[in-house]
UniProtKB/Swiss-Prot annotation:
Single biological process term from Gene Ontology: L-histidine catabolic process to glutamate and formate
Cross-referenced PANTHER family: HISTIDINE AMMONIA-LYASE
Enzymatic class: lyase
The reaction(s) this protein catalyses: L-histidine = trans-urocanate + NH4(+)
Pfam families per UniProt: Lyase_aromatic
Assigned GO CC terms: cytoplasm
Species of origin: Streptococcus pyogenes serotype M49 (strain NZ131)
Stated name of the protein: Histidine ammonia-lyase
Lineage summary: Bacteria, Bacillati, Bacillota, Bacilli, Lactobacillales
Length: 513
């Protein structure tokens, strides 16, 4: 039976977002939402017919909120809004981000506080389910008043305007609709505002980054465990007794993950008089990785709330009361997404330092740069350079976006969140850090193969090593390889969900204790 996810505005999960955005799972409006949507719409129709003054319905927008709009112009007002607010810039957002945006906007609208027609929500849903993906430039949002510019680009194809992708081809909005067998619509009063006023874009991008960060946290524990085995690391820093007296959840989870991954390993040791402690990047993995786990768990809790929230303005209450407020303001997510970027950056930072320990012959006691006959061969020399470059770039990107604000709209919107920038930066940091972790895993596997005594790996690390070696080659000499290709293979392996799933079938991994 084909899976379909019901959207009721209350129960959408991060896993649902991933299923719809990346796996193409279909969704539908839950029957329980229909009555509230229709009731909300009737209130808007009454406002127009009674010529009541309500922001964005019978007035202009932003600093033009005191300009009255006649009932006969309320429809044109909404189309004008979309045409002029679609002023983004830059490369188009990727397909999974666009699908997540469409999904989260639908889920917010079906709560019944936005005064939009059910048929208009269903039109956006039809585009999503039939794979018509609006062309949305990545830049141009202040994160307050919501994500106006990118969401206006989302709406354009619904009107037969703008551009959209359909089956991998970029088309005009009207042509995409025609090929998908979808009729365009005209907007009614308030509908343009309802579709574009909200934190949907920043939330969608941040939600995808959060999900990927959770997977990266587990991969970083795996990478660290493999590096520990290369160095015959001391296992006492991961004993449960040490961490129960400082019961930080992420720290406890990391220590347990490392213990699980290394169970049965013959490549670890205990402290001796000649070697009392390992360096921080190995010994303090529970404290370093764990701090990022706690940060990202907090961010996920905020995402879970936001994907089921109303971020429109004004809000149409069930009793007919209309409230002009500030739920569109992205600050509640801008700060968490800045935090997300910092947390992921630290994972990349510590992984790069472990890469250095692997390629440095004085630290690893292996051939320089993990290759036979160093000098003639450079091996992994420049992979560490690349990791250092990415780690340093992350440090720049990790500067918080939310501490900045530029007033807009004739100073009516005088303090903005920059939350969309925060989310986009977090995703870039994620991509950089994932490449660093992939490099660490590749270097650790190379180092294990170079060890003169190759003992049994741990229960979890052996599964990972065996899977990795099916795709990524041992580098014997520089002459016969292009290391860039092998690095790309390494990235592809760890990004494939089946890799981590296989490890987790062997051992339990978690981000919270």
């Amino acid at each position: 039976m084909t899976r379909v996810i019901n959207l009721d505005g209350e129960s959408l999960t991060l896993e649902d977002v991933i299923a719809i955005a990346r796996q193409g799972v279909a969704c539908r409006i839950d029957d329980s939402a229909v009555e509230a949507v229709n009731a909300s719409r009737k209130i808007v129709d009454d406002i127009v017919s009674e010529k009541r003054v309500v922001y964005g319905v019978t007035t202009g927008f932003g600093s033009l909120c005191n300009v009255s709009i006649s009932p006969e112009d309320t429809v044109q007002l909404q189309e004008n809004l979309i045409r002029t607010h679609a002023s983004g810039f830059g490369d188009p957002l990727p397909e999974d981000a666009v699908r997540a945006i469409m999904l989260i906007r639908i889920n917010s609208l079906v709560k019944g506080y936005s005064g939009i027609r059910l048929s208009t929500i269903e039109k956006l849903l039809e585009l999503l389910n039939k794979g018509v993906h609006p062309y949305i430039p990545e830049k141009g949002s202040l994160g307050a008043s919501g994500d106006l510019a990118p969401l206006a680009h989302m709406v354009l194809p619904m009107l037969g305007l703008g551009k959209a992708y359909y089956k991998g081809e970029l088309l005009s909005g009207q042509e995409a609709l025609d090929k998908a067998g979808i009729d365009k619509i005209s907007l009614a009063a308030k509908e343009g505002l309802a579709l574009i006023n909200g934190t949907t874009v920043l939330t969608a991008i941040g939600a995808l980054a959060t999900y990927d960060a959770i997977q990266l946290l587990k991969l970083s524990d795996l990478a660290g465990a493999l590096s520990l085995e290369v160095h015959n690391g001391i296992t006492s820093p991961f004993e449960e007794n040490l961490h129960t007296i400082r019961p930080q959840s992420g720290q406890l989870a990391t220590a347990r993950n490392i213990r699980n991954l290394l169970e049965g390993s013959q490549n670890t040791t205990v402290a001796t008089q000649s070697r009392v402690q390992d360096p921080y990047t190995l010994r303090c993995m529970p404290q370093i990785h764990g701090a990022s786990k706690d940060s990202i768990a907090y961010v996920k809790s905020k995402v879970d709330i936001e994907i089921n929230s109303v971020t429109d303005n004004p809000i149409i209450c069930k009793d007919g009361h209309v409230i002009s407020g500030g739920n569109f303001h992205g600050e509640p997510m801008a700060q968490p997404f800045d935090f997300l970027g910092i947390a992921i950056s630290e994972i990349g930072n510590v992984s790069e330092r472990r890469v250095e320990r692997l390629v440095n012959s004085q630290l690893s006691k292996l051939p320089s740069f993990l290759v036979k006959y160093p000098g003639l061969n450079s091996g992994f020399m420049i992979t560490q350079y690349a990791c250092a470059s990415l780690a340093s770039e992350n440090k720049v990107l990790a500067h918080p976006a939310s501490v900045d604000s530029i007033p807009s709209c004739e100073n009516q919107e005088d303090f903005v969140s920059m939350g969309t920038t925060a989310a986009r930066k977090a995703f870039e940091i994620l991509k950089n850090s994932r490449r660093i972790v992939a490099t660490e895993i590749m270097a650790a596997c190379q180092a294990l193969d170079l060890k003169s005594e190759n003992h049994e790996l741990g229960k979890g690390t052996k599964v990972a090593y065996d899977l990795f070696r099916k795709e990524v080659n041992f580098i014997e000499h520089d002459k016969h390889i292009e290391i860039y290709d092998e690095l790309n293979k390494a990235s592809t392996v760890i990004e494939d969900p089946s890799f981590l799933e296989a490890v987790e079938q062997a051992v339990e991994l978690s981000i919270q204790f």
